[in-house]
């Protein structure tokens, strides 16, 4: 019979509660039952006094880390990011692009698609395309030279280059063609976010009804609020 393993720590962030100090069972690398009482018998106890144990963090919007940028298009840089993030408690992430040329974004998507299963630390769960379908009024750090309306053919080229791992894309809902674009890519399993936008409430509603489900840079990269026009 395989020896049971438990980890002791001061605090555990469980599914619906925070408990501790206590012991958490580990079976084949997976967390099991929690108990406040010290396990007895033939068991292995890993002691982490003074430590907190929590599920790994998921970073869904990250452009770079450890002096590396996703838009550098550097496979080794992506690996360095992965290692660095794991040391911060992040166990999975979505490398995030910036607005750039169609060709550059294709290259970046391809590079991440080729390396994502080889990273040594935090796992890559997909790619987040932040842009280029934004508007200039709230461009932030995005380059408006490459802004344009959502284009399914272009997006599918990026998706093909990535090997199908683009999982999220942000756009401005006032751009032409948004409704069809959102409906299509959400049906394909891609999460659509709204951001860097000067849309009215009505324009945003169209995108939400079409399937958009995330808001990016709320209250700073968006139209201002007014008591007669809620933005």
Where in this protein do the model-derived segments appear?
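Active-site core of metal-dependent hydrolases
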Residues: 160-231
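N-terminal metal-binding scaffold of metallo-dependent hydrolase/deaminase domains
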Residues: 1-40
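Conserved phosphate-binding/catalytic loop of the ribokinase/pfkB sugar-kinase fold
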Residues: 135-163
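Divalent metal-coordination and catalytic microenvironments
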Residues: 10, 24, 29, 50, ...
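Active-site mouth loops of central-metabolism enzymes
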Residues: 64-76, 141-148, 191-195
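Charged helix-capping and loop-helix junction motifs
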Residues: 74-77, 108-111, 151-153, 228-231
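Divalent metal-dependent hydrolysis catalytic cores, especially in the metallo-beta-lactamase
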Residues: 63, 79-108, 122-135, 162-174, ...
């Amino acid at each position: 019979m395989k020896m049971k393993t438990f980890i002791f720590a001061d605090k555990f962030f469980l599914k619906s509660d925070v408990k501790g100090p206590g012991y958490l069972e580990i079976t084949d690398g997976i967390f099991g039952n929690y108990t406040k009482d010290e396990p007895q018998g033939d068991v292995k106890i890993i002691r982490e006094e003074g430590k907190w144990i929590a599920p790994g963090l998921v970073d869904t919007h990250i452009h770079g880390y450890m002096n590396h940028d996703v838009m550098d298009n550097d496979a080794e840089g992506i690996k360095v990011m992965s290692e660095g993030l794991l040391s911060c408690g992040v166990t999975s992430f979505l490398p995030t692009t910036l607005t750039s040329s169609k060709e550059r974004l294709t290259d970046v998507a391809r590079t991440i698609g080729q390396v994502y299963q080889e990273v040594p630390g935090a796992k890559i769960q997909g790619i987040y395309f932040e842009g280029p379908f934004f508007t200039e009024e709230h461009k932030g750090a995005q380059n408006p030279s490459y802004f344009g309306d959502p284009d399914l053919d272009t997006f599918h080229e990026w998706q093909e280059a990535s090997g199908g791992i683009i999982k999220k894309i942000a756009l401005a809902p006032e751009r032409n063609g948004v409704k069809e674009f959102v409906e299509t890519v959400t049906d394909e399993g891609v999460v659509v976010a709204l951001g860097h936008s000067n849309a009215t409430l009505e324009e945003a509603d169209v995108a939400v009804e079409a399937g958009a489900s995330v808001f990016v840079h709320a209250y700073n990269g968006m139209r201002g609020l007014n008591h007669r026009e809620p933005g």
